[in-house]
Amino acid sequence: MSAALTEISPELESQEVSQTTCCVVGGGPAGVILSLLLARKGVSVTLLEAHDNFDRDFRGDTIHPSVLELLDEIGLAEPLHRLPHAKIHTGALMTPQGPVTLADFRRLKTRFPYIMMLPQKDFLAFVAGEAARYPNFRLLMGARVEELIEEGGVVRGVIYEDDNGKAELRAELTVGADGRGSRLRHLGGFEQVKTSPPMDILWFRVPRRTEDPDGGLAYFGGGHMLVMLNRGEQWQAAYVILKGSSKQVRAAGLDALRSALAELVPQYAERFEDLRDWKQVSMLSVESSRVTSWFKPGLLLIGDAAHVMSPVGGVGINYAIMDAAEAANVLAAPLKEGALNEGHLREVQRRREWPTRLIQAVQKRIQKRVIAAALDPSNTFRVPVAFRLLLRVPILRNLPARVIGFGFKKVHVKP
């Protein structure tokens, strides 16, 4: 960990020094859930978020049944549902040959047979607010981690900077939950295994009307693909383009983009006219990767910091939160008792690595067999035969909904 501090420099000796049991870096879904679950168990937790608020681009708004069940176990599903939200009960592929229902969440055996659509800033504020009920929880916004504190090969906390200058936060365990561009992953020198998804995404919103479908829809045709998710009064739209082609799309202009969208989904042509400025469109560079080891002494990575997910299936948030829940299950007792060791960190990786690698393998296959084919203008897109057969077999047709809704392994909150 060459980027970490091996000793405290003299200029920092006069800065603020604080102590916590667990320092969580990153106020995304994994970070806030882990902080809440540890705080509930009596562990002293400090959560550092680099930004001044929770409202940022590319934050998915999906909350899957697995997350809702987990929140229900700690009494938070009902109050969460009081926030303004929408529900997606089905996911369909709109192909040139007609619609194909990919996932019907209503068939799942759960109290929450849908994907909840809730602005992520509201979800994060809700969970952070619940964590703030515990006196052993502290949230620092606008706190940017600069360095790791390392002593004898063990991470003992971080040096961060906020509006008051640099400060030292010492901790028995530091958790990197700081997303796909993880600062802690970089500082810790973690090795990544990367893959190259064939696409990037243009991310924007257009008006939605009450008579519109309430599901998640994916449109295919003419070498183009558009995913639309119900956000209540708006559609959250993801226009899928070939990897590295965003400059050409922008150079062609907004008129060309609106025309391509209208050709793909003519019934929404009028809505696409609302796109009048490139500032309304954000580009998401799609990537997929995982670290070979999730931990080093005193340091653990979870969520996108440990495994960057492709947006296929929209499961990244679900997996990040399951990482957090499993980490809390394993770590709460040893942290509270002062008995944490490397074996506990290894156990977190053991429980969560195989579901992550499995879903990434599935995503890779879908990217190769479905999305790459859909983006080839020389081909007429057709749903692969094996996939159509799967959806027709009663015992198998619920599998896509289950994998999207719950992943390959359910995680429960340890009593």
Predicted regions and their residues:
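Conserved FAD-binding catalytic core of PHBH/FMO-like flavoproteins
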Residues: V154-V286, R290-V291, F295
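C-terminal helical "tail/cap" subdomain of flavin- and related membrane-associated enzymes
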Residues: S2-S9, N329-P415
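Glycine-rich FAD pyrophosphate-binding loop
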Residues: V25, A39-R59
